[in-house]
């Protein structure tokens, strides 16, 4: 977590603002710093000057004299998140404030002479603390005025907060309107007073301006007090104390326990017990002595100042890190270059934060052998450059205004070069007599010649001793406890850091001796001496010189002669006062802008509140509708449940009826499936019978054809028998006279006729023609001689074909018969394929066994039996005519097969089932 510091305020005062880099921008930081500075106003005023409010209280207005109730206090002292009502708007405050002070502001901003010269009286100067009453802070109702800077006014003696008296805005004037009486902030410091107020009231910081989480800002003046953020909650024993008791009490002083070494390590240091120590009281004396020579312009010797007034930390030769820095006086104007232009109005009069690297933290071990811890630089170098100071990486566009001084803790063995500035050891810096006239002259010459009039001094860090564990717990549990100091000079301070397991910030500080009360007494004595010196100088000097001479006389033990360095110092102080006047004017303009911005933020906040109220009302309406809808749905659900419970019995009865119907339908379905199986079996049987019917029809057709052939054969035989009878009759008539050669031949041929008649015997018996049997030998014995004669005569006239031709006719007839049977079976197979049925392949393979009819087999047997006998002309003609009929039938069957195959192929392509595995006929 990085720290950013911004310093602003009047002379001897500054506002230390530490922000977190992860929370908010620099502009918001500066805005909160301005609000915090201008908002810490107190209602306490001096009794003898009721109509002259101090600087910074011009905007304080009490609309009611009634103190806030404890309930209001408890609400105000919360965590800073609860808004509180305001009595009047910020825009009205700004209008009243600037209407009363516009003329003074314009005249003061154009003048180069200092106007804010504070005169010191016996009761308000650097005297005792008797003029400060016991402070009990009462919270104002205005949040902007609740945290006004206390460094801008001095409490009046005997003033009590319990008085409800408050002046109006018209009766109040700024403190510099009356040039005859102005005031210097008295000791103790404002930080100490703030701590005292916090111990007496838990509601010191307003929750609007003080935010422990985002921005932490405190007001401090020239003192040895450490800048830190405190917890608003204080223990009971710190309540209701007077200021002197608070200053003398050991509670205010920092405790040293066993945890100091751990705290130093957490802060980034390496503590050792042998580190040279700078006591707070002795440091005050040394700084006061040196200030008379360097004109109050203190800078750490290892810092680099560029013409823009920026600060650049030099690298340590020992550890390569940077020592912590504490800003103790207001600095000159400069602006960071990388910020946007519209941010410069908030930042041009404030010191930007230090760009200090985290890894460049200095070590306290480098202080062991330090021989030149305190060195004064005259600001010049042999080659014309300002010693070891190099320009920073900050802005270079803002003019230089050298205001205020800084003190930086250094941990290098030798901070400056030996040829650039005189060196002083730790022992030498204890006495002012060790600083001789040559050193003074060198400082005067350095102020005249260098471009920056600021000279530097480095202060050694304080050694840390262990704290007791119980004291560490007390610090973590209780409020912040710091050490106060008197005087207007600043002593070195350390960087704030966060203690573990605690939300408050503590500082590493030097150990406190047991003679803390003696130190307070010494400081009070010193203040009284300074007061007497101030009274002596005020009688014969101007108001401006009176203030500076009082500081000078405090350093030189009452010396009344003004040297050249003192004149230069007075001139510089005049310039500083003029710069402060310009800063006041700028801050007033910034305040107006801040009030305008606050008013604008209030308007935006009101708008957001209205929108949120509207959204909440709409959400409430939506919620109401949603609740009503849910209630309606619940009612419907209850009704549905009731209806379901009442209708369970009816539904159960219907369910049983449906189950019975389903069971019956399943039984009917099973019966239908059984019937379908039977029908499919019958259909298969029908298809088989159908195929057998076709076969039987084909066989019947063949038998009919054979029957017709037999009939024709019978008719031919009858004609031949008639012819033979006729011939026999003729022979008998011609041969009636006796034996002739023809009769002898008939006797010889009688042995051959049975063989001729043999082929017809079976046919005649089959047809039942018993009358057509050949003539008996007994009946024809009388004609033998005449018949033989006729046979001899007719044998010479008979026309038979050759035996080879007869065999060819018989073979051709047999092949035609087989082809005819094959074609018939193939036709039946193709017909079944066309109908989508499985073909009977076994029938095709067994054509000869299944297809050949009995008549055809008998014909084959007859032809084989008569194969040796040649055909006659008439028999040959009959056989050829039969063969022609068979060939015609064969051609007809082949044409039918061709047509069926064509139809089957087209049907297969149309159905996309051309690749199915079926019986293909080659």
Curated annotation (Swiss-Prot):
One of its GO terms (cellular component) is microtubule. It comes from the Eukaryota. Its main location: cytoplasm. It is found in: Cytoplasm, Cytoskeleton; Apical cell membrane; Cell junction, Hemidesmosome; Cell junction, Adherens junction. Residues 99-113, 539-563 have a biased composition (Low complexity). One of its GO terms (biological process) is germ cell development. Residues 1-10 have a biased composition (Polar residues). Disulfide bonds: none annotated. Keywords: Cell junction, Cell membrane, Coiled coil, Cytoplasm, Cytoskeleton, Membrane. The keyword Cytoplasm applies. Residues 564-728 form a coiled coil. Residues 43-54, 70-94, 256-276, 468-484 have a biased composition (Basic and acidic residues). Residues 1-134, 250-277, 465-491, 533-563 are annotated as: Disordered. Plays a role in the assembly of microtubule arrays in the germline acting redundantly with ptrn-1 to control circumferential microtubule assembly along the body which is necessary for larval development, viability, and morphology and integrity of the epidermis. Required for microtubule stability and anchorage by binding to microtubule minus ends. Recruited to hemidesomosomes in early embryonic elongation to direct the nucleation and growth of non-centrosomal microtubules. This is Non-centrosomal microtubule array protein 1. It comes from Caenorhabditis elegans. The gene is noca-1.
